[in-house]
């Protein structure tokens, strides 16, 4: 019987434009790109040149600090560009896909009998190990430091987030194979939602299944770690996106790197929100082709509205994004005395508007923050929506002031920027909490290096 963990703190934000639970089409492009910024904490070193031929699974770049950690091409074809930005920062590596795809061949693995070291070695060779993150610091992990536990969260409850059960259909065997492989490395925990009924989740083998019943951000892997096996100083846990678990399973079963995934195209500015089957690195212009109600005054997001990255049609699907969201930008909206109007269509957490009476209402929110940054108000706002055993407001103050000792005492090793996404949404001070937490983690990582 799965362990049920009930959470009271949090906030569900019901937005218009949720994807219907059907895969509308398969999106294919002539060009793909792998973006290093999609792998947090990685300093890329490109190992290919323009004009080189690569197969799907061949390395495009490696982590400069851990050269064994490779990042593989999603397709076979010719490398057409290595784009760089300021100070020669690698922005992306583009590959022109050939019509008939060819895959680099790797060994298959009997995961039930394999050693943990064999699992890690194969993931490193195939360029998939970089999809594993770690706590503390919420960055791509170091393969030389073994974790005390591994966490996979199959619950996606951010606004307009993709339902993993849709992606799981047809990939059940690969998912279970990936879970079994991870369990050979360390004790593995699978977090699912109370409403998720897929047999591959509820009856998952070789892992400990925990059911999380509560509002967003119950699906955040950091929240689940905090309630099951908290991270103390000197300890490491690995966290894995469930889509990556499927990638791992395919590799062990077939010996090929197949980065096909199901992505939600959602948001109020999308004509018919639905799911599409595509590859990591697909151009957003191809994914959103003929899907937008308008190309003007829209915010395109690589990911969900709270934790995703602002993008454009010229960008590519992030390696870890489960959805592409399009909402109104709000830069063409003029409101007269907006703060004093009844505003039944405006979402409010403080009952400032009568909209709180409309339970279950879907809101069409835009990208405006509706106010400027101001002094931090110690009102307990963060604690109401953050179901973790930490003092969130005091931790944020410690990060801002650079008090590392205080940060450690307040639990910074347990948190990720995404854990503060809902708190950032409700924050009266309009602070960029996720950026503040990321900056704090980066400083701490350098101090402890």
Which residues fall in each region the model found?
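N-terminal, Lys/Arg-enriched amphipathic/low-complexity engagement segments
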Residues: 1-47, 62, 212
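Short, solvent-exposed loop/turn positions at domain surfaces
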Residues: 42, 48, 65-68, 272
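Short, well-structured beta-strand-loop connectors
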Residues: 48-62, 80-81
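Glycine-rich, histidine-containing beta strand-loop boundary motifs that form or position
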Residues: 58, 64, 75, 83, ...
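Short coil-to-beta-strand transition motifs
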Residues: 68-76
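Buried, small/hydrophobic-residue-enriched core segments of structured protein domains
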Residues: 69, 83-449
């Amino acid at each position: 019987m799965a362990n049920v963990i009930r959470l009271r703190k949090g906030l569900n934000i019901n937005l218009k434009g949720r994807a219907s639970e059907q895969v509308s089409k398969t999106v294919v492009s002539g060009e793909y790109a792998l973006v290093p910024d999609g792998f947090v904490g990685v300093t890329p070193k490109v190992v290919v040149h323009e004009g080189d031929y690569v197969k799907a699974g061949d390395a495009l770049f490696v982590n400069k600090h851990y050269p064994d950690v490779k990042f593989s091409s999603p397709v076979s074809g010719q490398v057409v560009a290595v784009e760089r930005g300021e100070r020669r920062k690698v922005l992306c590596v583009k590959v022109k896909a050939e019509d008939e795809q060819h895959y680099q061949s790797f060994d298959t693995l009997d995961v039930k009998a394999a050693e943990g070291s064999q699992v890690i070695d194969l993931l490193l060779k195939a360029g998939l190990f970089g999809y594993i993150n770690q706590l503390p610091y919420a960055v791509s992990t170091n393969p030389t430091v073994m974790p005390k536990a591994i966490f996979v969260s199959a619950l996606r409850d951010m606004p307009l987030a993709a339902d993993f059960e849709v992606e799981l259909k047809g990939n059940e065997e690969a998912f279970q194979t990936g879970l079994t492989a991870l369990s050979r490395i360390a004790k593995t925990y699978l977090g699912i939602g109370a409403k998720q009924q897929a047999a591959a989740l509820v009856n998952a083998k070789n892992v400990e299944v925990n059911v999380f019943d509560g509002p967003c951000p119950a699906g955040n892997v950091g929240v689940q770690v905090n309630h099951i096996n908290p991270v103390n100083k000197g300890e490491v846990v690995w966290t894995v996106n469930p889509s990556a678990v499927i990638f791992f399973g395919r590799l062990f079963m077939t010996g090929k790197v197949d980065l096909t995934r199901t992505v939600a195209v959602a948001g109020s500015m999308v004509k018919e929100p639905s799911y599409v089957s595509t590859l990591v690195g697909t151009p957003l212009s191809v994914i959103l082709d003929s899907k937008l109600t308008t190309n003007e005054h829209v915010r395109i997001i690589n990911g969900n509205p709270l934790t995703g990255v602002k993008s454009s049609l010229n960008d590519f699907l992030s390696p870890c994004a489960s959805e592409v969201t399009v909402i109104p930008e709000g830069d063409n909206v003029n409101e007269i005395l907006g703060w004093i109007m009844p505003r039944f269509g405006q979402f409010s957490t403080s009952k400032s508007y009568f909209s709180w009476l409309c339970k279950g209402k879907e809101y069409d929110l835009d990208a405006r923050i509706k106010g400027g940054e101001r002094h931090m108000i110690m009102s307990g706002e963060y604690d109401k929506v953050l179901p973790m055993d930490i003092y969130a407001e005091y931790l944020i103050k410690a990060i801002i002031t650079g008090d590392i000792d205080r940060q450690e005492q307040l639990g910074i090793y347990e948190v990720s920027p995404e854990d503060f996404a809902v708190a950032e949404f409700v924050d009266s001070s309009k602070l960029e909490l996720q950026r503040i937490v990321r900056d704090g983690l980066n400083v701490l990582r350098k101090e402890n290096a």
